[in-house]
Amino acid sequence: WDHHAIVAKCALENGKNVADEVPSAMNLEECWELVNLAEQKQLNCMILENCCYDWFEMRTLNMAQHGVFGEIIRAQGAYIHNLDEFWDYYWKNPNGSDPEQLGWRLKYNRENRGDIYATHGLGPVAQALDIHRGDRMALLVAMDTKSVHGKELVEAKTGKPCNDFRN
Protein backbone atom coordinates (compact mmCIF):
# COMPACT_ATOMS: atom_id res chain seq x y z
CA TRP A 1 0.00 0.00 0.00
CA ASP A 2 2.78 2.41 0.89
CA HIS A 3 4.24 1.85 -2.56
CA HIS A 4 1.14 2.43 -4.69
CA ALA A 5 1.50 6.23 -4.90
CA ILE A 6 5.27 6.02 -5.41
CA VAL A 7 4.93 3.60 -8.33
CA ALA A 8 2.01 5.58 -9.82
CA LYS A 9 4.01 8.83 -9.65
CA CYS A 10 6.98 7.16 -11.33
CA ALA A 11 4.76 5.89 -14.15
CA LEU A 12 3.15 9.31 -14.64
CA GLU A 13 6.53 11.03 -14.62
CA ASN A 14 7.60 8.65 -17.38
CA GLY A 15 4.58 9.29 -19.60
CA LYS A 16 2.45 6.29 -18.68
CA ASN A 17 -1.26 6.20 -17.91
CA VAL A 18 -1.93 4.66 -14.51
CA ALA A 19 -4.54 2.25 -13.18
CA ASP A 20 -3.66 1.89 -9.51
CA GLU A 21 -5.20 -0.58 -7.08
CA VAL A 22 -6.71 0.69 -3.83
CA PRO A 23 -5.52 2.41 -1.86
CA SER A 24 -3.88 4.58 -4.49
CA ALA A 25 -2.50 6.88 -1.82
CA MET A 26 -2.15 6.82 1.93
CA ASN A 27 -2.95 10.48 2.63
CA LEU A 28 -4.44 13.56 0.98
CA GLU A 29 -1.05 14.96 0.05
CA GLU A 30 -0.30 11.87 -2.04
CA CYS A 31 -3.79 12.04 -3.58
CA TRP A 32 -3.24 15.61 -4.74
CA GLU A 33 0.25 14.78 -6.01
CA LEU A 34 -1.26 12.11 -8.26
CA VAL A 35 -4.10 14.38 -9.44
CA ASN A 36 -1.78 17.31 -10.14
CA LEU A 37 0.84 15.19 -11.88
CA ALA A 38 -1.76 13.46 -14.08
CA GLU A 39 -3.20 16.84 -15.07
CA GLN A 40 0.24 18.33 -15.68
CA LYS A 41 1.27 15.40 -17.88
CA GLN A 42 -2.23 15.09 -19.41
CA LEU A 43 -2.38 11.41 -18.53
CA ASN A 44 -5.02 9.22 -16.93
CA CYS A 45 -4.67 8.12 -13.33
CA MET A 46 -7.55 6.04 -12.02
CA ILE A 47 -8.20 3.91 -9.00
CA LEU A 48 -8.49 0.36 -10.30
CA GLU A 49 -11.07 -0.89 -7.85
CA ASN A 50 -10.80 -4.59 -8.61
CA CYS A 51 -14.05 -5.43 -6.79
CA CYS A 52 -15.99 -3.56 -9.47
CA TYR A 53 -14.82 -6.02 -12.10
CA ASP A 54 -15.29 -9.42 -10.47
CA TRP A 55 -17.75 -11.80 -12.13
CA PHE A 56 -20.50 -11.33 -9.53
CA GLU A 57 -20.34 -7.54 -9.62
CA MET A 58 -20.20 -7.42 -13.42
CA ARG A 59 -23.16 -9.79 -13.71
CA THR A 60 -25.13 -7.72 -11.19
CA LEU A 61 -24.26 -4.52 -13.07
CA ASN A 62 -25.42 -6.11 -16.33
CA MET A 63 -28.70 -7.11 -14.70
CA ALA A 64 -29.19 -3.59 -13.32
CA GLN A 65 -28.49 -2.06 -16.72
CA HIS A 66 -31.04 -4.39 -18.31
CA GLY A 67 -33.75 -3.46 -15.81
CA VAL A 68 -33.94 -6.81 -14.04
CA PHE A 69 -34.31 -5.02 -10.68
CA GLY A 70 -36.57 -2.25 -11.95
CA GLU A 71 -35.69 1.29 -10.91
CA ILE A 72 -33.04 1.07 -8.20
CA ILE A 73 -33.69 3.78 -5.62
CA ARG A 74 -31.68 2.43 -2.69
CA ALA A 75 -28.68 0.17 -2.37
CA GLN A 76 -26.47 -1.28 0.30
CA GLY A 77 -22.92 -2.52 -0.05
CA ALA A 78 -20.44 -4.35 2.14
CA TYR A 79 -17.09 -6.02 1.91
CA ILE A 80 -15.97 -8.90 4.10
CA HIS A 81 -12.41 -10.08 3.77
CA ASN A 82 -11.45 -12.70 6.32
CA LEU A 83 -7.66 -12.78 6.29
CA ASP A 84 -7.17 -15.23 9.17
CA GLU A 85 -5.35 -17.83 7.08
CA PHE A 86 -3.16 -15.16 5.44
CA TRP A 87 -1.93 -12.99 8.33
CA ASP A 88 1.36 -14.92 8.57
CA TYR A 89 2.09 -14.55 4.86
CA TYR A 90 2.51 -10.76 4.92
CA TRP A 91 6.14 -9.71 5.16
CA LYS A 92 7.36 -9.09 8.65
CA ASN A 93 9.39 -6.26 10.15
CA PRO A 94 9.77 -4.02 7.08
CA ASN A 95 12.50 -1.46 7.78
CA GLY A 96 12.62 -2.54 11.43
CA SER A 97 9.20 -0.99 11.99
CA ASP A 98 7.47 -4.19 13.13
CA PRO A 99 9.43 -5.58 16.09
CA GLU A 100 6.47 -7.74 17.20
CA GLN A 101 6.51 -9.49 13.81
CA LEU A 102 2.81 -8.89 13.19
CA GLY A 103 3.24 -8.33 9.47
CA TRP A 104 2.62 -5.05 7.70
CA ARG A 105 -1.10 -5.56 7.19
CA LEU A 106 -2.05 -6.48 10.76
CA LYS A 107 0.25 -3.72 12.02
CA TYR A 108 -1.56 -1.22 9.78
CA ASN A 109 -4.94 -2.30 11.15
CA ARG A 110 -3.63 -2.04 14.69
CA GLU A 111 -2.43 1.54 14.18
CA ASN A 112 -5.16 3.02 11.94
CA ARG A 113 -8.90 3.43 12.23
CA GLY A 114 -11.39 3.45 9.40
CA ASP A 115 -12.71 1.48 6.47
CA ILE A 116 -9.57 0.46 4.62
CA TYR A 117 -11.49 -0.73 1.58
CA ALA A 118 -14.52 1.55 1.45
CA THR A 119 -14.59 1.39 -2.34
CA HIS A 120 -14.73 -2.43 -2.39
CA GLY A 121 -18.31 -2.32 -1.11
CA LEU A 122 -19.25 1.08 -2.51
CA GLY A 123 -17.81 0.84 -6.03
CA PRO A 124 -20.14 -1.84 -7.41
CA VAL A 125 -23.14 -0.12 -5.80
CA ALA A 126 -22.14 3.20 -7.38
CA GLN A 127 -21.89 1.51 -10.78
CA ALA A 128 -25.34 -0.07 -10.46
CA LEU A 129 -26.79 3.32 -9.48
CA ASP A 130 -25.06 5.13 -12.37
CA ILE A 131 -23.23 7.41 -9.94
CA HIS A 132 -21.30 10.04 -11.92
CA ARG A 133 -22.90 8.70 -15.10
CA GLY A 134 -26.21 10.46 -14.72
CA ASP A 135 -26.92 10.31 -11.00
CA ARG A 136 -25.22 11.30 -7.77
CA MET A 137 -25.38 10.35 -4.12
CA ALA A 138 -27.54 12.59 -1.97
CA LEU A 139 -26.88 10.66 1.25
CA LEU A 140 -24.26 8.15 2.29
CA VAL A 141 -24.29 6.37 5.65
CA ALA A 142 -21.31 4.42 6.96
CA MET A 143 -21.29 2.36 10.14
CA ASP A 144 -18.55 0.98 12.31
CA THR A 145 -18.16 -1.41 15.22
CA LYS A 146 -15.49 -1.80 17.83
CA SER A 147 -12.53 -3.99 16.99
CA VAL A 148 -12.68 -7.40 18.60
CA HIS A 149 -10.98 -9.95 16.39
CA GLY A 150 -7.90 -7.86 15.54
CA LYS A 151 -7.15 -7.33 19.22
CA GLU A 152 -7.43 -11.09 19.76
CA LEU A 153 -5.04 -11.77 16.85
CA VAL A 154 -2.37 -9.44 18.23
CA GLU A 155 -2.71 -10.92 21.71
CA ALA A 156 -2.39 -14.46 20.33
CA LYS A 157 0.69 -13.53 18.29
CA THR A 158 2.49 -11.52 20.99
CA GLY A 159 1.28 -13.22 24.16
CA LYS A 160 0.65 -9.75 25.62
CA PRO A 161 -2.50 -7.71 26.23
CA CYS A 162 -3.37 -5.40 23.34
CA ASN A 163 -5.26 -2.29 24.35
CA ASP A 164 -4.33 -0.14 21.37
CA PHE A 165 -5.89 -1.98 18.40
CA ARG A 166 -7.71 0.68 16.41
CA ASN A 167 -9.46 -1.06 13.53
Where are the regions that the model predicts?
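Conserved donor-binding loops in enzymes that form glycosidic bonds
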Residues: 1, 49-50
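Beta-loop-alpha module in the N-terminal Rossmann-like domain of NAD(P)-dependent dehydrogenases
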Residues: 1-37
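Short glycine/serine/threonine/alanine-rich loop segments
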Residues: 16, 43-44
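General secondary-structure edge motif
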Residues: 18, 40, 104-105
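Hydrophobic residues in well-ordered beta-strands that form the structural core
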Residues: 20, 27, 45-47, 76
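Predominantly a Rossmann-like dinucleotide-binding segment in NAD(P)-dependent oxidoreductases
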Residues: 44, 51-167
